[in-house]
C-alpha cells in the first residue's frame, strides 16, 4: 500500500491560507502553481480554467462575446467562491489585480507575484499570441507595455515578489517555498 508523503512543514504554519499567484499573462502562474501545490499538499485551482468550465467556452470567446468587463465580473465571482475555501494554490488571471474589490479576497491569503521580466514575457507571448485577447491589436507589444505599466503598481502590492527567468516551474515552486517562511510568524516554541 502506497503511503502519501508527509505534508511539508510549512503547511501547518500556513494555517490553511490560500496562496494566490499573480502576474502578467504568460508569467508561469499555472505551470508553477501545480508543483507548488503538490509540494505543500495543497489543492490547485486555475481561475481561468474554472471560468472556461463555467462559461462552457474558451476565454478569447468570452472576451469577444462579453467584453473585458463581463469577463472581469465572472473572474471576481470565481475568486469570491474560491476565497471561501482554504489550503489552495490559486493561479489567477493576469488582470485580477485590476479590480479593487478582488484585493479583499486576495489579502485573506498570501499574494505571490511571479515576474519573469518584460523580455521573457514577450518571448513567451510571441509563442502563444492567439490565446491572449488583450493583445489582439495592431501593435501587441505596445498593448503589452500599456497593460504592464497599468498593473505594475498593483503587482507590487503582493506579499512576495519572485523574479523568475527561464527556470523550470518546479524550481520556481521551490524558490517560493524557500521565501514563504519570511512572511509567516515563527512557529511556537515548546518550553520543556
Curated annotation (Swiss-Prot):
Gene that produces this protein: aroK
Entry cofactors: Mg(2+)
Presence of the UniProt keyword Cell membrane in the record: no
Cofactor note: Binds 1 Mg(2+) ion per subunit.
Keyword Cytoplasm among UniProt keywords: yes
A cellular-component GO term for this protein: cytosol
PROSITE patterns named among the record's database cross-references: SHIKIMATE_KINASE (PS01128)
Protein name: Shikimate kinase
Annotated ATP binding sites: 26-31, 132
Biological function: Catalyzes the specific phosphorylation of the 3-hydroxyl group of shikimic acid using ATP as a cosubstrate.
Binding positions (Mg(2+)): 30
Annotated Gene3D superfamilies: P-loop containing nucleotide triphosphate hydrolases (3.40.50.300)
Amino acid at each position: 500500500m502506497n503511503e502519501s508523503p508527509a505534508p511539508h512543514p510549512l503547511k501547518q504554519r500556513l494555517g490553511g491560507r490560500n496562496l494566490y499567484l499573480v502576474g502578467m499573462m504568460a508569467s508561469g502562474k499555472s505551470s508553477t502553481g501545480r508543483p507548488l501545490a503538490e509540494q505543500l499538499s495543497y489543492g490547485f485551482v486555475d481561475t481561468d480554467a474554472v471560468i472556461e468550465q463555467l462559461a462552457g467556452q474558451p476565454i478569447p470567446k468570452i472576451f469577444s462575446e462579453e467584453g473585458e468587463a463581463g469577463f472581469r465580473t465572472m473572474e471576481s465571482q470565481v475568486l469570491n467562491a474560491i476565497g471561501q475555501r482554504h489550503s489552495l494554490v490559486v493561479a489567477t488571471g493576469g488582470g485580477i489585480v485590476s479590480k479593487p474589490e478582488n484585493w479583499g479576497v486576495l489579502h485573506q491569503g498570501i499574494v505571490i507575484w511571479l515576474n519573469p521580466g518584460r523580455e521573457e514575457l514577450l518571448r513567451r507571448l510571441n509563442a502563444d499570441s492567439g490565446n491572449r485577447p488583450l493583445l489582439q491589436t495592431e501593435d501587441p507589444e505596445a498593448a503589452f507595455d500599456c497593460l504592464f505599466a497599468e498593473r505594475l503598481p498593483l503587482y507590487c502590492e503582493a506579499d512576495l515578489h519572485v523574479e523568475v527567468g527561464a527556470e523550470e516551474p518546479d524550481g520556481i515552486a521551490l524558490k517560493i517555498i524557500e521565501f514563504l517562511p519570511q512572511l509567516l510568524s515563527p512557529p511556537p516554541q515548546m518550553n520543556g
